[in-house]
Curated annotation (Swiss-Prot):
Organism, as annotated: Treponema denticola (strain ATCC 35405 / DSM 14222 / CIP 103919 / JCM 8153 / KCTC 15104)
GO annotations of cellular component type: cytoplasm
Name of the protein: L-methionine gamma-lyase
GO-annotated biological processes: transsulfuration
Subunit structure: Homotetramer; dimer of active dimers.
Listed InterPro entries: Cys/Met-Metab_PyrdxlP-dep_enz (IPR000277), Cys_met_metab_PP (IPR054542), L-Met_gamma_lys (IPR006237), PyrdxlP-dep_Trfase (IPR015424), PyrdxlP-dep_Trfase_major (IPR015421), PyrdxlP-dep_Trfase_small (IPR015422)
Top-level enzyme category: lyase
Catalytically driven reaction(s): L-methionine + H2O = methanethiol + 2-oxobutanoate + NH4(+); L-homocysteine + H2O = 2-oxobutanoate + hydrogen sulfide + NH4(+) + H(+)
Length: 401
């Protein structure tokens, strides 16, 4: 099916059929083209492909039929023109940003971000003369005030990792483009997936994913994606990846992600249903000081969540009374949940940001980003919700005895 035909289909049909390729053997599953290079018919053909005058494969760092399948699938689901894969989520982030900025440029970013993204923006880019201003993106006016004549990127996570702050994508995109139509609004959509939120439809220019998480969904792949206009994705592919990061997704990993994405919608429905039940339990437990989950009416940005998200996801941030030591006690007391970083797996994962994912932050940076010492991040899995709740209850009860 061509792209126009696919666009008429529902989400579930797209996630199964988008990107599918026919092969001469009639294999139903996507073939794994485990090759580093591709043969040319002639020197002239090789020249045309390197000059981008002819479509076709050259070298797997630049593209591979198996990775093309999953790239086209995600582009279709995000309503983007094109997609570029990378060997990790941070590989997608760096390949994307390096293809845009030069020394002397400026970026506005949310003050609360995934730890490695923050480290790259705050510590890495400064070594190369790129200035980054971090703001609380819950209020679009903060973004507006931070914009400069040399601002090339507005970088957002919504919900933000780990404290679940939301950003009004449509409002920020309008502000950024009014300031400079060439300014790229980049949204990390890892927490939501295209099933729950589509930033391009809301005015953003670029969408990023760590496909390690929900897109793959089974905890056995490291991968990332960049989605946007074809012209920009070509720039990421032939500048950001080819010449700068070399962050290339292997064909076997691409195959696994494509397989995982065929069940994305039903997995996300279950994740979200479980998370709602778990959040409602946590909100009432006496050991919990505060909880951030967009599906709770007590969540400060509940109305924004309803406006730009289909469902509220499966990530929960909650702070336990007693600070750092209480957080450690809770983590060390769970028996059913798995203590691990990452998210979006079938298993429920629990972790302590201050000592794990956000260790690249200094204590002062964590405080400035509203990451409390007792904050716990929970990735609600696909198990029975009652079993997840029972485990959390026995662990939390130890904090109030």
């Amino acid at each position: 099916m061509n792209r126009k035909e696919l666009e008429k289909l529902g989400f579930a049909s797209k996630q199964i059929h988008a990107g599918s390729i026919k092969n001469k053997y009639g294999a139903l599953a996507t073939p794994i083209y485990q090759t580093s290079t591709f043969a040319f018919d002639s020197a002239e053909q090789g020249g045309r492909r390197f000059a981008l005058e002819e479509e076709g494969y050259i070298y797997t760092r630049l593209g591979n039929p198996t990775t093309t399948v999953v790239e086209e699938k995600l582009a279709c689901l995000e309503n983007g023109e094109a997609c570029m894969s990378a060997s990790s989520g941070i590989g997608a982030v760096t390949s994307c940003i390096w293809s845009i900025v030069n020394a002397g440029d400026h970026i506005v970013a949310g003050k609360t971000l995934y730890g490695c993204t923050f480290a790259f923006l705050n510590h890495g880019l400064s070594r190369f003369g790129v200035d980054v201003t971090f703001v609380d993106t819950r209020d679009p006016e903060n973004v507006k005030k931070a914009l400069k004549p040399n601002t090339k990127i507005v970088y957002l996570e919504t919900p933000a990792n780990p404290n679940m702050y939301l950003c009004d994508i449509a409002a920020v995109s309008k502000i950024a483009h009014a300031h400079n139509p060439e300014c790229k609004v980049i949204v990390d959509n890892t927490y939501m997936t295209p099933y729950l939120q589509r930033p391009l439809d809301l005015g953003a220019d670029v969408v990023l994913h760590s496909a390690t998480k929900y897109l793959n969904g089974h905890g056995d792949v490291i991968a990332g994606f960049v989605v946007g206009k074809k012209e920009f994705i070509d720039q990421v592919r032939f500048v950001g990846v080819k010449d700068m990061t070399g962050s290339t997704l292997g064909p076997f990993e691409a195959y696994l992600i494509g397989r995982g994405m065929k069940t994305l919608d039903i997995r996300m429905e279950k994740h979200c249903a479980n998370a709602q039940k778990v959040a409602e339990f946590l909100e009432k437990h006496p050991a919990v000081e505060s909880i951030a989950f967009p599906g709770l009416k007590s969540f400060p940005q509940y109305e924004l969540a309803k406006k730009q998200m289909k469902l509220c996801g499966a990530m929960i941030a909650f702070t336990v009374k007693g600070g750092l030591e209480a957080g450690k006690t809770l983590i060390n007391s769970v028996k059913f949940a798995t203590i691990a970083v990452s998210l979006g797996d079938a298993e429920t994962l629990i972790q302590h940001p201050a000592s794990m994912t956000h260790s690249p932050y200094t204590p002062e940076e964590r405080a400035a980003s509203d990451i409390a010492e007792g904050l716990v991040r929970l990735s609600v899995g696909l198990e029975d919700a009652e079993d997840i709740i029972a485990d959390l209850k026995q662990a939390l009860d130890k904090l109030v005895k």
